[in-house]
């Protein structure tokens, strides 16, 4: 599969995953490993996983919780359900290979999304961050 995982690692590596400057197969493998370990914990289905991989909004609460679990496992969602910008910046550096232009975009996306107001519910927060990541990635021509 040639899709960049995101968002997540939309989802989600604070936009760095959307920059495509890293080993997509390795990133997707890490995302899948994390997601598969989270699925039983949150009651997510294969359909929830496929939505995440395809960078689509979650259609179920379990799908939102799957994203929150993955983001926590990766280290970018903290115990309070907020983006950990310091960890996100480190992930951005790692996944952009420190390419200055790509790193700048990834950090901009991460900082923009970290500044949004999200619900206290961690699952809903993860979905809100994912929506932000997708929107910002589109603005930068990455999706």
From Swiss-Prot:
User: What keywords are annotated for this sequence in UniProt?
Assistant: Disulfide bond, Secreted, Signal
A Gene Ontology term for the protein's cellular component = extracellular space
Q: Check the UniProt entry and state the signal peptide residues, or none.
A: 1-21
The cellular location(s) given in this protein's UniProt record come to: Secreted
Q: Which molecular-function annotation in GO is an example for this chain? A: pheromone binding
The record's disulfide annotation reads 38-69, 65-123, 113-132
Protein name per the record: General odorant-binding protein 28a
